[in-house]
């Protein structure tokens, strides 16, 4: 990993040198129309794996239109701009990471800071050092963060909104009291 000077300091660049060279050498013209002629709004663009609550996880098809629509809706909802930095600590095969985070950030022209896995110990450090402004949470993430010892720096951050599902009203209220006026978009 090597540092990449992002909008608020260094952000880990997970690409290796060979990949960097491939990207630099890639053609800049539009992808040939003949290669995309059969792609429609309904054509699957990615597979999202279910949680496996009724058996083994299953691959669910996600269309181009649905992915693009996710970004359109959430861009307006969270008022995303190119100045935002989205924080993604979820695996990219997870629906929230593959849709809400990526499509919204790309639609807005915003950056995405990736972490290999969620860390309660590193969360606020990452938010502060990388200028994170928008975060996608799931389930108990906010409760895990609330269970960390209070710090005088709890309100010293640029996180302006979080979007996700599974936040209880009690944790939601305690979250705002402790970490300040972070706008929460709870939904499914």
What are these regions (language model features)?
Residues 68-85, 93-133, 148:
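Conserved AMP-binding/adenylation subdomain of ANL enzymes
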Residues 1, 58-61, 88-89, 110-117, ...:
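Short beta-strand->loop structural element characteristic of the AMP-binding/adenylate-forming
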Residues 36, 121-124, 173:
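Short hydrophobic/charged patches on amphipathic alpha-helices used for structural packing
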Residues 1-41:
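ANL superfamily adenylate-forming
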Residues 26-49, 56, 79-85:
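Conserved pre-ATP/AMP-binding loop-to-beta segment of ANL
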Residues 107, 129-137, 146-188:
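Gly/Ser/Thr-rich phosphate-binding loop
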Residues 44, 50-53, 86, 92, ...:
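Conserved S/T- and glycine-rich ATP-binding loop of Class I adenylate-forming
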């Amino acid at each position: 990993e090597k540092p990449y000077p992002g909008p608020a300091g260094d952000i880990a660049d997970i690409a290796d040198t060979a990949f960097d060279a491939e990207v630099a050498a890639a053609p800049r013209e539009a992808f040939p129309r003949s290669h995309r002629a059969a792609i429609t709004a309904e054509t699957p663009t990615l597979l999202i794996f279910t949680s496996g609550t009724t058996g083994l996880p299953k691959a669910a098809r996600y269309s181009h239109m649905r992915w693009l629509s996710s970004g359109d809706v959430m861009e307006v909802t969270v008022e995303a701009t190119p100045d935002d930095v989205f924080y993604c600590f979820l695996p990219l095969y997870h629906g929230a990471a593959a849709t809400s985070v990526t499509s919204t950030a790309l639609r807005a022209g915003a950056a995405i800071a990736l972490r290999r896995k969620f860390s309660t110990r590193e969360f606020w450090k990452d938010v502060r050092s990388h200028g994170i402004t928008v975060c996608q949470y799931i389930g108990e993430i906010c409760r895990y963060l609330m269970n960390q010892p209070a710090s005088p720096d709890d309100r010293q951050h640029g996180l302006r909104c979080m979007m996700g599902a599974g936040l209880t009203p009690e944790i939601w209220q305690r979250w705002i009291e402790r970490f300040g006026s972070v706008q929460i978009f709870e939904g499914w």
